Structure formats: C-alpha cells, structure tokens
C-alpha cells in the first residue's frame, strides 16, 4: 500500500467570474486541475455572460478583492498567480516568474 502523501502545486487566479464556464476563474480552475494543480481564486467581477457575449459586468470592490487574496495566501499560499485579462497591466508592471497574465 502506498502511503506517500501527494503534494500539489498551488495556483491562484485573480479574474472575473464567467457563469458559462468558458472563461474567467471557472476556466482557470479547470485548467489548473487538468495540470495537476490545486486551484484557488479571487473574484474581481461578476459577469453576466454566455457563449454569445457579455451583457453586464459588476465589479467587486477593491477592498473585498484584496481580502480574498489575503485569505487565500495566509491559509493556502500560492506557488503561482494567474491574473485575468482585465488586470494584465498589474502583472506587466511587476514582472515576476511566478505571475502569469492573460494578455486579452
């Protein structure tokens, strides 16, 4: 019997929420899982969207986004951070090898 504990890389996505599952944190979490990573998220916007298009965006207050990020990092941590399309400028201004940004 194998009793070796499996460890996973931890990845945090900071992005909007897409209810259709094709973009945003939903797509990121599926990708992390497919790559063998434990995925966590901080939601920056709730989006009214489907496969046809976006009909509305409701931004999450900055202080709440910061709170989500702190909660994840204080408890679970992150080996890498992926920043969604609308937040790419933040990543570009703070170049690190463990931060990835969606250029869209």
Model feature map: region roles:
Residues 1-55:
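Glycine-rich phosphate/adenosyl-contacting loop at the front of the ribokinase-like
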């Amino acid at each position: 019997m194998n009793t070796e504990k499996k460890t996973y890389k931890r990845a945090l996505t900071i992005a909007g929420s897409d209810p259709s599952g094709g973009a945003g944190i939903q797509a990121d979490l599926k990708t992390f899982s497919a790559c063998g990573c434990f995925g966590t998220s901080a939601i920056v916007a709730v989006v009214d969207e489907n496969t046809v298009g976006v009909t509305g965006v409701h931004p999450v207050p900055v202080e709440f986004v910061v709170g989500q990020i702190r909660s994840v990092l204080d408890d679970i941590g992150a080996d890498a951070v992926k920043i969604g399309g609308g937040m790419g400028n933040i990543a570009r201004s703070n170049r690190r090898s463990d931060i990835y940004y969606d250029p869209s």
